[in-house]
């Protein structure tokens, strides 16, 4: 991902700037090398205390074998240049080539040999132990009951919950991995992109548009309030929400006779497909409803289908970047920037 590449470049420049141009003799080189190894060994054994959702945990200052038990933790580590040795499966990855992780980071994990650790709510404890991790990152909302078992394997740091907390969770995971400064830089870069989008929308007279977010699945439909991942980002950009949607909370179930409730200036929707085609069939059924067809937002060609993984399930910094890209492409289309991302390849390959 470009943010992590910028950070890596900055670190390299810092290291090079600190190098002495003088050439020491071989004895000095030997002493320096031995001292460096000793310092490194000492640093590797150093620990620090981290406050998190389950209390305070003592972690290694420089963990090398990190296990991630949420997708947002996986994204956090990848964005900071750390590839987990093991990671839980992504939820609802139907149709993805890798079959285990979301397409915007799955190939990176696959190429690195990252071990599949099962589902977020049913992790494979034996597989985790076999990896001999020195840090485990998880979430209280999913794994509170097995926290003690995980802590018996390695120092374990938990975030609290998914809803409306993607930024806080990034900082929690980064703190566990001694990468809080890097995470702060990532958020600053993301904020700069969000503020630039806000300024561009304002200049185009489009910042006051009301934005609705809708999900279709086999069992029905819903629209989202302000505490979902995507709507939190929409609000941070400064875009407006329809009055019915502009409230604290997660989502509202939708019935077909209440379709007019989702009208807005712009509507983004995604489909939670699980591999049997039923959600896609439900999508087509909803879109064919007369009440849907009569919506002003539909008549104005202001409906945009986006990726369910990045907009609704992954909750990470990489996904947050994709949502910004999709908002720009939909609301400020240009000749070279008018495609909504379907995330068919890893974000890190997009540069």
Predicted regions and their residues:
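Bacterial N-terminal signal peptides that target proteins for export
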Residues: 1-7
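Basic- and aromatic-lined ligand-binding clefts that recognize polyanionic substrates
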Residues: 65-68, 73-77, 184-240, 244
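Short, low-complexity, disordered segments immediately C-terminal to signal peptides
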Residues: 20-42
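A short, structured surface patch at a secondary-structure boundary
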Residues: 74-125
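C-terminal motif of bacterial Sec signal peptides marking the signal peptidase cleavage site
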Residues: 15-18
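Proline-aspartate-enriched helix->loop->beta-strand connector
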Residues: 125-127, 132-137, 155, 263-267
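Extracytoplasmic ligand-binding site segments that recognize negatively charged/polar headgroups
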Residues: 91-97, 143-145, 159-172, 208-231, ...
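Structured C-terminal subdomain patch of bacterial secreted/periplasmic proteins
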Residues: 204, 265-351
